[in-house]
């Protein structure tokens, strides 16, 4: 025997001796001594330390020292009352500064299930293994320590270790090496025995008991030759055996019967240790990952080991499950002649693997609770678990499993090999059987399964005959989609990707039919493709967790399939896809966002949005149509009519009092509207007496200026002498309408309704929660109506018209035919001003202007030779289109406001008076600042050769 020859030598007396084992030297990164002062020790502990040191000195484990190195030493008392000496080697163990680590020789515990079943066992424990292994002579001084003297009354005593000190970084590795060398001859001679060695614990198994005894006898001799000793009181020869804290029976392996203390679980470190211990025995217990999710969740958050943690009720239930499994769980010792198989179960959260032999459970296999990737497909998890467990089986027995059983059909397995890189890696070089038939046993029935293994709703190819929807998101928090319909969603996120994720979720919720989704975010596309069957990695970002979970729930709840793909944004490529994506991008542009925000605050109308922001008519209409308040309050409009109007700002006002009950004491709303510009001013009052009217008018003067004329109803506050005196002081003329007939006040009556509607919109559907008082609410409504809204046939706001006198009608100054209802004839005139449903016409030089409905107007578009015939409806038919059709020809398709100020009742057309006409004519001439008669020449030409002196001469000459 070569090994025996190496160990045995012949002395000069002729007797055989045993050569002592050769020490293993340590590698040091520095030769600079490390000295850590010894701290003072109590008298009792100091006495115990002296006794222990003398004992170790007698055994030859330590020796006196004068080393420049020093490590503190201390003692602890065991439950038995005996003392134990320990050395604080933390400074010496500093990996990056002092000592070179050797690395572990046994990185994991051996599986006891690999011990052949029914084989007899012997288990031994080496006594004081570290103290029987010598240190290299040059390393001894590095492990010196000092025993101090009380009050320094005598010199301290110093020693250094000659054997492996407990607590040294490389002591376990050196111990494993020494014991392994001692056992090598045993393994070589008894190769058919099964021997497990871990640190200083040794297990021997043999098929026959006689063989086991022979192996044990030889092992005793080899251990003694190596200078090691067996603890005689720890030899086990009968069941149940206890090894590596597990209980071994003839065919079963059971975990230790322990109870988990919950009262000590207070910090992250406590829970980390607990879960580390549970994970150590999970391959035996068989607790799936999903059954410990709440315990794993406690580890999230602050990484400080002392940070506080609390045991939740759900986690308490999971600890109880662990305790129950500890009491009942068991695995089986194997038959060395039978192959192993791997079963993959599609459990919730992540798949579970089981190593079996026939129907006997050998070991459980699980994936970590947390993954590296944000989304991990379930199929990829299965592939990872297969690869992981295959390596485990090869490590246990040296062979691949004979069969792998998966919850997939043959076609699904074939597709997995084609499409999944993870599947190809997990099953690389596997030559066994892939099956989907599970053994019939009750062992696995408690597992909670999932059906989300492969996608059911998500498609990898575009759907035919399906709607196509484009999505987009912006960093301003807006998400949108466009397709059969458009929608813009305001989100709380300041990330374009998260906003786009909201857009995709909204599309999946809004379209209950097959759809193709096109997004310009590759991140969102990939997430949506994978989320159906994916395990979502937990993130410290709660918002992101909520979004991903909502996306997964939305996809899984769908009844119809969808396909999603990526398109590059902001390219110059031609085609409908690029244009549609640009349209989706416009929906979340800053201009559109600002328009949405303004409408949410003020409920401005479509034309106002179009005028103020760079948005299309369709986008402006969509904003108003998607507003729930504006939809409810979109009232039908009446046919337009005519009330006398001013021809310039502050020429003619109408004034009235309306009521808003929600304003309480201030429910009397005094309203004034300028009939030229439609500028509105209103104040909240506690009544409608003359004093309240005067107070309101003074407020109007401060904002609008002083009018020339005011028209009111016949209320007491307007007919009093005090009010007449007030108007006289301000040089304002006053007229009233027909008693009990509101048609003469149609403009202000409609204004009342407009104002009330706007108040309701802003109160129930606006973002203006800071407007709490009645006057604040009223001011916001007035701001919207005056400075934001634009009405049909207008190009500017009421405020701009009032302040600048700018005209709105594109027809002003045009030559027209107008119908004289008294004479039933058509006359030629010139438009002074034009509104929706009304117009003011100048019949000719030195004639008062006439207010008429637009249905009595015709455009003059060709000359007529006979002047007398031209004025008769019987002799000449006007050759022109109607006003309404002309509006369309001029492209005036702007959407009217729901409650536009100028939509008065047509029944008020007859309210025109000669006095009003005269005033209007005067105002018009003064406002124009033009005394040249040519301004009102019948032909309408500024360079009329007749100077506009005679309409008939003008017609005959200019024609």
Swiss-Prot record:
* Alphabetized GO MF terms: DNA binding; RNA stem-loop binding; RNA-directed DNA polymerase activity; RNA-DNA hybrid ribonuclease activity; zinc ion binding
* Positions of the RNase H type-1 domain: 463-593
Span of zinc fingers (Integrase-type) = 590-631
Composition bias of kind Polar residues appears in 872-884
Q: Where is this motif: YXDD?
A: 198-201
Q: Where is this region: Disordered?
A: 867-893
One Pfam annotation reads Integrase_Zn
This protein's UniProt keywords: DNA integration, DNA recombination, DNA-binding, Endonuclease, ERV, Hydrolase, Metal-binding, Multifunctional enzyme, Nuclease, Nucleotidyltransferase, RNA-directed DNA polymerase, Transferase, Transposable element, Zinc, Zinc-finger
What is the name listed in the Swiss-Prot or TrEMBL entry for this protein? Endogenous retrovirus group K member 19 Pol protein
| Organism of origin | Homo sapiens
Q: Which gene underlies this protein? A: ERVK-19
């Amino acid at each position: 025997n070569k090994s025996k020859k190496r160990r045995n030598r012949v002395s000069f007396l002729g007797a055989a001796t045993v050569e002592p084992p050769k020490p293993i030297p340590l590698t040091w990164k520095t030769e600079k001594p490390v000295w850590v002062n010894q701290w003072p020790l109590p008298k009792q502990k100091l006495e115990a330390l002296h006794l222990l040191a003398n004992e170790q000195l007698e055994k030859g484990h330590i020796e006196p020292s004068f080393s420049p190195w020093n490590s503190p030493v201390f003692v602890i008392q065991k439950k038995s009352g005996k003392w134990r000496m320990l050395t604080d080697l933390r400074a010496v163990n500093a990996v990056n500064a002092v000592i070179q680590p050797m690395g572990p020789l046994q990185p994991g515990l051996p599986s006891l299930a690999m011990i052949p079943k029914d084989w007899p066992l012997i288990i031994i424990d080496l006594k004081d293994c570290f103290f029987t292994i010598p240190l290299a002579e040059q390393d001894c001084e590095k492990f010196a320590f000092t025993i101090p003297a009380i009050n320094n009354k005598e010199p301290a005593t110093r020693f250094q270790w000659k054997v492996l000190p407990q607590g040294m970084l490389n002591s376990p590795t050196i111990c494993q090496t020494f014991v392994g060398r001692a056992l090598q001859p045993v393994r070589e001679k008894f190769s058919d025995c099964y021997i497990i060695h871990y640190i200083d614990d040794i297990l021997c198994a043999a098929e026959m008991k006689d063989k086991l005894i022979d192996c044990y006898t030889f092992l005793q001799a080899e251990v003694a030759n190596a200078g090691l000793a067996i603890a005689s009181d720890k030899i086990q020869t009968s069941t149940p055996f206890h090894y590596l804290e597990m209980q071994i029976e003839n065919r079963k392996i059971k975990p230790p019967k322990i109870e988990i203390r919950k009262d000590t679980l207070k910090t992250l470190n406590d829970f980390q240790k607990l879960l580390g211990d549970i994970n150590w025995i999970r391959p035996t217990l068989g607790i799936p990952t999903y059954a410990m999710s709440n315990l794993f969740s406690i580890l999230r958050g602050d990484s400080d080991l002392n940070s506080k943690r609390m045991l939740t009720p759900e986690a308490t239930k999971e600890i109880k499950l662990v305790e129950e499994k500890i009491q009942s769980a068991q695995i089986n010792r194997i038959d060395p002649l039978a192959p192993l198989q791997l079963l993959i179960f599609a459990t919730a959260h992540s798949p579970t693997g089981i190593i079996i032999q026939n129907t006997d459970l050998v070991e459980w296999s699980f994936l970590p609770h947390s993954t590296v990737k944000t989304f991990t497909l379930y199929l990829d998890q299965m592939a990872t678990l297969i690869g992981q467990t295959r390596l485990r089986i090869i490590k246990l027995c040296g062979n691949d499993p004979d069969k792998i059983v998966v919850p997939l059909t043959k076609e699904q397995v074939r597709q997995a090999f084609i499409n999944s890189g993870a599947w190809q890696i997990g099953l690389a070089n596997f030559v066994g059987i892939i099956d989907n038939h599970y053994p019939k046993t009750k062992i696995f029935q408690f597992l909670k399964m999932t059906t989300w293994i492969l996608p059911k709703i998500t498609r990898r190819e575009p759907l035919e005959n399906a709607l196509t929807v484009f999505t987009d998101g912006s960093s301003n928090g807006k998400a949108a989609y466009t397709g059969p319909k458009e929608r813009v969603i305001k989100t709380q996120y300041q990330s374009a990707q998260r906003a786009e994720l909201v857009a995709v979720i909204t599309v999946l919720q809004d379209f209950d039919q097959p759809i193709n989704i096109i997004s310009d975010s590759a991140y969102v596309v990939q997430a949506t493709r994978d989320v159906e069957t994916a395990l979502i990695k937990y993130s410290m970002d709660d918002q992101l967790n909520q979004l991903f979970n909502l996306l997964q729930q939305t996809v899984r709840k769908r009844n119809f399939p969808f396909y999603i793909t990526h398109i590059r944004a902001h390219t110059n490529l031609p085609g409908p896809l690029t244009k549609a994506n640009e349209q989706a991008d416009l929906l979340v542009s800053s201009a559109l966002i600002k328009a949405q925000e303004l409408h949410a605050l003020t409920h401005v109308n479509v034309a106002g949005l179009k005028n103020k922001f760079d948005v299309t008519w369709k986008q402006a209409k969509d904003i108003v149509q998607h507003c729930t308040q504006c939809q409810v309050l979109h009232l039908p409009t009446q046919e337009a009519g005519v009330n006398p109007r001013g021809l310039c700002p502050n020429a003619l006002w109408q004034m009235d009092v309306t009521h808003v009950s929600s304003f309480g004491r201030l429910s009397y709303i005094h309203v004034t509207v300028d009939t030229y510009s439609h500028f509105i001013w209103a104040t909240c009052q506690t009544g409608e007496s003359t004093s309240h009217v005067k107070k309101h008018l003074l407020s109007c003067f401060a904002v609008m200026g002083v009018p020339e004329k005011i028209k009111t109803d016949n209320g007491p506050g307007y007919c009093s002498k005090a009010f007449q005196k007030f108007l006289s002081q301000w040089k304002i003329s006053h007229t009233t309408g027909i008693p009990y007939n509101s048609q003469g006040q149609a403009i202000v009556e409609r204004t009342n309704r407009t104002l009330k509607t706007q108040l309701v919109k802003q109160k129930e559907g606006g973002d203006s929660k800071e407007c709490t008082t009645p006057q604040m609410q009223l001011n916001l409504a007035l701001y919207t109506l005056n400075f934001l809204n634009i009405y049909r046939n207008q190009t500017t706001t009421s405020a701009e018209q009032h302040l600048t006198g700018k005209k709105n009608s594109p027809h002003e100054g045009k030559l027209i035919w107008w119908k004289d209802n008294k004479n039933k004839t058509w006359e030629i005139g010139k438009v002074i001003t034009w509104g929706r449903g009304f117009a003011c016409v100048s019949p000719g030089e030195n004639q008062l202007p006439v207010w008429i409905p637009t249905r009595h107007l015709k455009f003059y578009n060709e000359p007529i030779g006979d002047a007398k015939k031209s004025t008769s409806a019987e002799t000449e038919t006007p050759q022109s289109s109607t006003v309404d059709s002309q509006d369309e020809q001029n492209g005036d398709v702007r959407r009217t406001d729901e409650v536009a100020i100028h939509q008065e009742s047509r029944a008020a057309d007859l309210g025109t008076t000669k006095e009003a006409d005269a005033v209007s004519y005067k105002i018009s001439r003064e406002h124009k600042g033009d005394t040249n008669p040519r301004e009102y020449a019948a032909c309408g030409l500024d360079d009329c050769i007749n100077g506009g002196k005679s309409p008939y001469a003008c017609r005959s000459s200019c024609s």
